């Protein structure tokens, strides 16, 4: 017996008729299933107990032998072996076919294996197998060729002409005879000879035939086994038939398909016994062939067999295929024990590594652990009574549960799991109620919110699994995002707002200019109302105990606010005191301009000093990243908890709310709108006089209204109070952006219609005034499109991730250095005026490929195979170096993977990557995860055909599939200069490029935006117009590195 749990791999081969018979426990002769009166399986039918085993444990069919003591006895009345009913999941039967039948996988699959072995086209095979033509199996001494097809008429004519000196046949029998006659050794030798001279199509065909024939030779399978003489019948419990309430039966589709095969097979046997005319027999054989095809792969050929309601029946192949098939549904992804799911709510008092688990859920999940502990402590005599105690919820089980879950991490998962941070480990804390409590800071990683999201809990059982969860998956360790190395646990919403409010500065407010000896004195004054959080005050610098202050600074007063003192109290003492949201203050030290001698008139000094900005979400992220860099994980997660608590506390104390009175009205709105209407009228007049085309008029109108909206927006911001709650929310980065504000208080602006073209009628109202019916209607298009896009793109993005993981999963860090001597030349990635990724960002954490020297002093800045630290990465562009050679995975020589040096540092830990890290999957998830946030739309530049450029998710798919892009740009094949750009008929332009040897002209559409002008120098592979370059064309014109660089730049966008 083979050990089912311990095997290296599975090998799939052809089963010979004898093999199928040896698996079988008997032949299924009748199509009957269950007797409708007795509900017992029919003898010799599809559920026969004699073949497949008894339906009840240790009991034969007729009831003569019952009980275990008759184990293994075969009943002399009904012939059923007394054994467990579980064997009905294991025992197979068989059907002896009255005529050979071809196996559809080998005849219809691509490429057709049967066709390759016989060197016949699939079309010819189909004609023979389905009884449309005869095939010559033995030519004898006639003028016919072996494997020649004959129609009915030709066959008759040749029979009369040659008599019995040749043999021809139809159906799978004829194919079987041909397959039996194949001489594998001889064919292989012939093909190897042919390959020496063959060219083109013949060569590829020969190679494919050779592959199949060699496979047959090595595996020991016989080609004729591709035609079935015996059909296996799978065990009945795997294709069950169950009685529903109401007396009807529900059955697996396979039973219907088997019934058709048996019916046709029996009819064919009867016809053969009766010696029926060949045309009737042929028709019956064809029907049998179709029935077997339907059973193995329904719908592969012709119309699928349908059940009630025209539903195609699920055949054996469908049981295995696709997302719902056996592999992806049951083998690779099972539902597991020791898991549960519930709604999540916020747990603001939790530590970073904790989650709240409802009691009833915890007792169910940890049941075996609790039962063991109860019996060990003597609270229960045996496992059974322990189980009863738990089911009755006896009071003593709760203390035991508390002890059991201590130090036992659980995994929390939120679907969709788009990247590895979608499953993290936490230590459970028992909570009342039925909702899971989640730490607010991990919401970003899970992309969770508390509006009814659900999460699943899984319990790692073995000590190894627990250790793995604790060391690798504990939430407190996942502070950096694996895709870019930036903090992923950043405060959001209330927490940002609280810290923003805490660090605000205001003038002429109670207690301004007071001097305090230390923070405690300041806090007492604040609690008693003598000073406000936002009051600018002075405090003795020494009392703050900050280790970054110099001796001189410690003898002085520090000008700060009460709120900033509180804010800094959560930071480590060796971290600079943060007084202003600047890089200098964060990375070097507190600027000395905020320190004044103790003799200063503080009030007068403060009045002269400019206001400092509060700390926004971006600043908080920078602080977290810096703390992580200096103090590593443990300290950072403690600090994050402190920042969270402080944020919640002060956003509550601030009492920031939103009311209609917070939405202010812009005084000059009517004048701005009137001026824009006049401009639009002017443009329309010019259009009517024929001074501009309709397209130009449309673009001008759109520009006018966009300018009006911007003007309103600027007026709004200028007239806003810095303490306006809506402004604070969007300025801090807690929620919303300035355009929300403009729509509430300014105007909604232009909207797109369902096709994506912008409607030139603007919505001049805002939400405070309310929209009229037409405006409401116009804005409903955009809203609807947004919702449908979101639904569609989630599925697309998931599928993209799946394909990316499929190709990248074998890319693993295999070695330290691959000894490659070349690398990649990197510089800023630029798109038009904006820089997408700076040189510093590209260098940090990578290894150098060549020595880099300072252009002026000529000193060595970095040697080959050394790591670019942040300092070096910043110093290089500062020295005026524009491009650098780095080691890259593109040029890595490692077999089946990459090396440490070419990959660079591990972004999720900030330290060097470990050998064995699955970097391919990390990369695939990092591209797939933001995919859901990308737009689905094709951008319409005013809806002109030809200038649509695909963006967002579809663009990413286009790059990875190396498709010919939509709106593809013409590129030059020469290095030289642009000599002329001429307009031609039928809306085309011709661009002439002259190189050193030759001149070429390129035709581009009139509407395309050109990237070059006359006199420009161009290099091979440069695009001449806007749009996406076809990577295959670029590869043809340039080299691999150029294409890799282009694709890299495109994905970065």
From Swiss-Prot:
Cell wall biogenesis/degradation is among the record's keywords: no
GO biological process, one term: DNA-templated transcription
Protein EC: 2.7.7.6
GO molecular function, one term: DNA binding
Pfam family, one: RNA_pol_Rpb1_3
Residues given in the record as Zn(2+) binding sites: 60, 62, 75, 78
Keyword Cell cycle: no
Catalytic activity: RNA(n) + a ribonucleoside 5'-triphosphate = RNA(n+1) + diphosphate
Keywords: DNA-directed RNA polymerase, Magnesium, Metal-binding, Nucleotidyltransferase, Transcription, Transferase, Zinc
GO cellular component: DNA-directed RNA polymerase complex
Cofactor binding comment, as recorded: Binds 1 Mg(2+) ion per subunit.
Cofactor: Mg(2+); Zn(2+)
Entry binding sites for Mg(2+): 449, 451, 453
Subunit composition and interactions: The RNAP catalytic core consists of 2 alpha, 1 beta, 1 beta' and 1 omega subunit. When a sigma factor is associated with the core the holoenzyme is formed, which can initiate transcription.
Entries under NCBIfam families matching the protein: rpoC_TIGR (TIGR02386)
Protein purpose: DNA-dependent RNA polymerase catalyzes the transcription of DNA into RNA using the four ribonucleoside triphosphates as substrates.
Protein name: DNA-directed RNA polymerase subunit beta'
Taxonomic source organism: Brochothrix thermosphacta (Microbacterium thermosphactum)
Phylogenetic lineage: Bacteria, Bacillati, Bacillota, Bacilli, Bacillales
